[in-house]
Curated annotation (Swiss-Prot):
GO terms for molecular function: auxin binding; zinc ion binding. This is Auxin-binding protein 4. It comes from Zea mays (Maize). Glycans are attached at residue 136. A motif (Prevents secretion from ER) lies at residues 201-204.
């Protein structure tokens, strides 16, 4: 009796259309952002083991009712994996609608507000989810999901501690929730990194 060997041909690969469009788009966006060049910092680094936050530079970058402190960061302190910000939003203030290819975690230190979270699985963010946030809560932003943090409280400040991965941050900004992901505008270096990181030169 002759035994036949089973066929050894490779199993058929699933068609590309079977791959989730959202996953494909997210991977393309992440690859595009991660391929951007990063220049060396031109700022002196503070390598102190202990630093007094009350003595750190606090700026609003032209946004009334907003303040930002880089508590520890890639350009000013030489961190490689994470960066930490302390941000305060006055009543009614909000971030731009934006996305980035890094992980981001918020800890609400005081006040209350609203997280608006869009989708990266469509061609544009779409109608955002509105999620209430308040003191002693924490929330995380999925990589490349468009979002906005808004102090929707009319009577008190919203203060948050923000932790991001893969600094310095590369941010894509949307005009509104219906703007296609491919039309979002890159802002790099971001405002608080401009003093330490010059904008990339146009090589053309």
């Amino acid at each position: 009796m002759v035994r036949r060997r089973p066929a050894t041909g490779a199993a058929p690969r699933p068609h590309l259309a079977a791959v989730g469009r959202g996953l494909l788009l997210a991977s393309v966006l992440a690859a595009a952002a991660s391929s951007l060049p990063v220049a060396e910092s031109s700022c002196p680094r503070d390598n102190s083991l202990v630093r007094d936050i009350s003595r750190m530079q606090q700026r609003n970058y032209g946004r009334e009712g907003f303040s930002h402190i880089t508590v520890t960061g890639a350009l000013a302190h030489g961190t490689k994996e994470v960066e930490v910000w302390l941000q305060t939003f006055g009543p009614g203030q909000r971030t731009p609608i934006h996305r980035h290819s890094c992980e981001e975690v918020f800890i609400v230190l005081k006040g209350k507000g609203t997280l608006l979270l869009g989708s990266s699985s469509l061609k544009y963010p779409g109608q955002p989810q509105e999620v209430p946030v308040f003191q002693n809560t924490t929330f995380s932003i999925p990589v490349n999901d468009p979002h906005q943090v808004w102090n929707s409280n009319e009577h008190e400040d919203l203060q948050v501690l923000v932790i991001i991965s893969r600094p310095p941050v590369k941010i894509f900004i949307y005009d509104d929730w219906s703007m296609p992901h491919t039309a979002a505008k890159l802002k790099f270096p971001y405002f608080w990194d401009e003093d330490c990181l010059p904008a990339p030169k146009d090589e053309l």
